[in-house]
Amino acid sequence: MLRCGLACERCRWILPLLLLSAIAFDIIALAGRGWLQSSNHIQTSSLWWRCFDEGGGSGSYDDGCQSLMEYAWGRAAAATLFCGFIILCICFILSFFALCGPQMLVFLRVIGGLLALAAIFQIISLVIYPVKYTQTFRLHDNPAVNYIYNWAYGFGWAATIILIGCSFFFCCLPNYEDDLLGAAKPRYFYPPA
């Protein structure tokens, strides 16, 4: 007898694990130094610093690095990414309470809405940074040097994509309340023999 059922009561903890991975990706994006790198490896930038050292520099004025917090767009990009990160952490904590008991399932749509808000903040940050960085430092003036948005910037986008997906699922989960609580009968994809 082949039985293929939907076991939501066992799988419901996947969403908080996805939120935890988004938190890890955001920490990497916030702390990472690989947001932008020149093709000749002379310039490396993070969310916070612009350095002209071969290895990227340490991110301090002593190494000849320039703070991006001197620019309004730099502060805006950092603030919106950090706001998205804080909302994500709050949603991660709330997800445990919301998935623990039947009386807390009403918070799932609230968590979904907050995750959508966090995703909007992060998208704003991840769009402001490359546009304003390119305009401010005139990256297109020297065609011999290419600039590559690197791994830490990619981790920021990965966290944002996870946030968009999780916000969708958290908004849809209340429709499957019986499945989440284990009260629904198993649904068979094949008729029982």
From Swiss-Prot:
Topology with respect to the bilayer: Multi-pass membrane protein
Summary of the tissues where the protein is detected: Expressed in the stratified squamous skin epithelium of the skin and the tongue, but not in simple epithelia (at protein level). Expressed in the oral epithelium, tongue epithelium and skin (at protein level). More abundant in areas of lower flow stress in the inner curvature compared to the outer curvature regions of the aorta (at protein level). Expressed in luminal cells and myoepithelium cells of the mammary epithelium (at protein level).
Induction note: Up-regulated by UV irradiation, doxorubicin (DOX) and Tp53 in embryonic fibroblasts.
UniProt keyword list: Apoptosis, Cell adhesion, Cell junction, Cell membrane, Cytoplasm, Membrane, Transmembrane, Transmembrane helix
GO biological process: amelogenesis; desmosome organization; heterotypic cell-cell adhesion; intrinsic apoptotic signaling pathway by p53 class mediator; mammary gland duct morphogenesis; Notch signaling pathway; positive regulation of neutrophil chemotaxis; positive regulation of proteolysis
Locations listed in the record: Cell junction, Desmosome; Cell membrane; Cytoplasm
Stated name of the protein: p53 apoptosis effector related to PMP-22
Native source organism of the sequence: Mus musculus (Mouse)
